[in-house]
Amino acid sequence: MRYYLDAAPIIYLIEQSQPFATAIRSKLAAPGIVPLPSELARLECRVKPMRDGNQALLQDFDDYFANTIAEIFPLKRDVVDLATEIRAQYNFKTPDSLHLAAAVISNCDIFMTNDQRLNRYTGIIIETI
């Protein structure tokens, strides 16, 4: 089962934000679960540590994406086109629309996020943490 990871679940994991980190780790450790973020999630995770000059946290994120994640989904034209449709129909923010489109195009089964507003989207199962 492929789990698309929005940036928030990754941030919770790396920063050990409880009780979220334990719940996320438990879900992702289940047999057959493949976590799949996109390049957008990688970007979003890296901004705050970079802005704050927190090299240790930035390295933790870089290590996670390099060593724990087997695949980072690229944002190509098909993702952007679907994101445009999602944004037009649901009026979500552009990053949220890109995340949802990436999850659908990459054939993920579940979209993991902390954003309850995204539950309105019907193109994939949304799991809110």
Q: Model-predicted segments: where are they?
A:
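Short, well-structured N-terminal submotif of metal-dependent ribonuclease cores
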Residues: 1-37, 50-63, 116, 127-129
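Conserved glycosyltransferase catalytic-site signature
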Residues: 7, 39, 96-100
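Short, high-confidence coil segments that cap the C-terminus of an alpha-helix
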Residues: 32-33, 92, 106-108
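Acidic, PIN/NYN-like endoribonuclease modules and their adjacent C-terminal/linker elements
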Residues: 1-2, 71, 100-129
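Acidic catalytic patch
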Residues: 67-89
